[in-house]
Amino acid sequence: MHPAIVAQASATLAAMYTGRHWLGLGSGEALNEHIVGGYWPETPERIARMFEAIEIVRKLFSGKDVKHEGKFYKLETTRLWTLPEQTPPIYIATAGPITAKKTGMLADGLITVGAPEQKIEMIFEKCREGCREAGSDPARFRFILQLHLSWAETDEEALRNAMDEWPNGGMKFPKQDIRSPFDFEQMAKLVRPEDFTGRMLISSDPEAHRREIQKFLDMGFDQVYLHNVGRNQAQWIEVFGREV
């Protein structure tokens, strides 16, 4: 999708829902995007495309007439005619040091997933380094976490939910270039319960989950979005709302 279309959609949502919309961007996954039959670039090029796209989105959010001639995208003179009262913040999904630094330079915040504390600290520092190089205040940069978990009434059920519904949580390799759900299905057969260790908390104990969430808040995350991988969503929301 051309970044101009993304910018228009984002600006329209922000105009409709003032203060409630932010734009999250990433470098993509083949599983979702190869189906249109276009060229699927290697990771470095996808990242470069993403940052050029952000440049275009930023220009359009200014409300001025915009023209762009870049390495990957072109834009004839145009502008966004529907602008929100508040420009939506742009958050980038990433987990690598080089991309994290550039995210600090160009974006308003970072989205990442649960990881060991040492890696999280590295990502934080690279983002703050990028902020300083760009002349912006690192204190205004937002860190957002998507935390996968599996909760159920018993540990056995929680593990079964993880194995059945979210086996990719135990896959210890990059998955961005996998093109077919059938390939995922075959790879999922290789996942064992121990593969989730240190990658996703699987527990029936709400207090264990509360401690896990608090651990990431203590690291410095501003927001933590929870993803319970099982289908027991209503029960999970009730229990976590009451006990976590």
Regions picked out by a protein language model, each given a short descriptive name:
Residues M1-E243:
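Active-site-adjacent structural elements that line small-molecule/cofactor binding pockets in enzymes
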